[in-house]
Amino acid sequence: MTTARIFGIGRHRLTVDGEGVTTLVTFNGCPLRCKYCLNKTSWDMDKGRDYTPESLFEEVKIDQLYFLATHGGVTFGGGEPLLQKEFIKEFRALCGPQWQIVVETSLNVPFEIVEEMNAVVDGYIVDIKDMNPEIYLTYTGKENTLVMKNLEWILQHGDAKHIKVRVPHIPEYNTDEDVAKNVEILKGMGVVDIDEFNYVIR
């Protein structure tokens, strides 16, 4: 039986995490250690509770009418949702193609996971952090080689309209010039939906 630790389920999110009305499901577990992480709960596997795909489906299907009427569905975040690929695949089999399934991801996962999941999900929200390898490493504690490889691949094998890339201004880590360069590179790669924003430091 597939299980995953989930620390949050947020209902009735309108156009924040994808099209229409969505429910945001946040998994524990993340390969990054971002300095300004907003979901540090995801680092602690003792927080939250365990779900099976079936128990999660039973909990969130209360909003099915909203999902169908607005072309919404479930967005999986975290933490890093792509680390829970079997869970998401089984959940997709339960909800069927009518619900939109989106992953909010760093893409800092093995390429094989992205390749396998591309046919399962309907869209991506990619938190790119910064495309400069040195800035990325300093801010997250990890290299961004996998991120770049995976982003290039999903742009080649998916629908760019369903790939949103979030580009943050990160205080003390990148500059406005860095962000402008990130946006320029992303446009050159074929990204059409770019969300530039300021990190809020808690």
Regions found by a protein language model. Give the residues of each.
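N-terminal [4Fe-4S]-dependent radical SAM core
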Residues: 1-45, 62-70
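Conserved H-D interstitial segment of serine endopeptidase catalytic domains
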Residues: 48
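Conserved AdoMet/S-adenosylmethionine-binding subsite of the radical SAM
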Residues: 61-65, 70-73, 77-78, 82-202
